[in-house]
């Protein structure tokens, strides 16, 4: 028995090592529990430390349903969830690509709260096809994959950290960003905003049309903040320029054409009905 050889597979050894690491992290988390109010104060302090950081802390999306109603989607950006995870502490976060079928990339994000033992896993799909149906180059697939992983991690973190806390912090940071826009001058911030969007070949007229204004003089601080959220959503890969600025216009044009065609058909039908009734009346007199 003393000379008996025990074979341990690599998988079992790796599992034992991982379990040991996690057990150690859980023990440390319980030894140094978080102070929720202190965590919140730290989040706000870091997010509002610099004006640029505050602008980058949230995203803004608008989507229209089949009835034409606009739904506003807002939340913490990828950069802000990095601040959240650092301040919330005792989190174990991971992200990876789990599938690539040549058409879409699927990323997985995992977040485990070692203190409360709450864990979530989220998946995000991103297309890797051009508008003409060709597959992205190797480099572009890497870029899309990295963005998908970051978004999947963000979604997992937002599942683990209480949403009521995140919403409260986002609201405070947005208020500070709005205050800075007003103090520094709306027109000055508008020029900076237009300059940022030029990277995506978007003009000031396109931005004005998006916020529903006819001239830059009508732009408000709230409009600047909304565009900052849209810019963050495009930059981190939550949406695209085409989905936000081009597709809505195309859908609107198609809807207008369909409505015009329907009205034209209705008028033709009414004329045909009128002619038919006229002929019937004449025949009756005869």
Regions found by a protein language model. Give the residues of each.
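Composition-driven recognition of long, low-complexity, acid-poor segments enriched in small hydrophobic
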Residues: 258, 262-265, 269-272
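Polyanion-binding surfaces on beta-sheet-dominated domains and ring/shell assemblies
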Residues: 1-105, 110-258, 284
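Long, low-complexity, intrinsically disordered segments
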Residues: 270-286
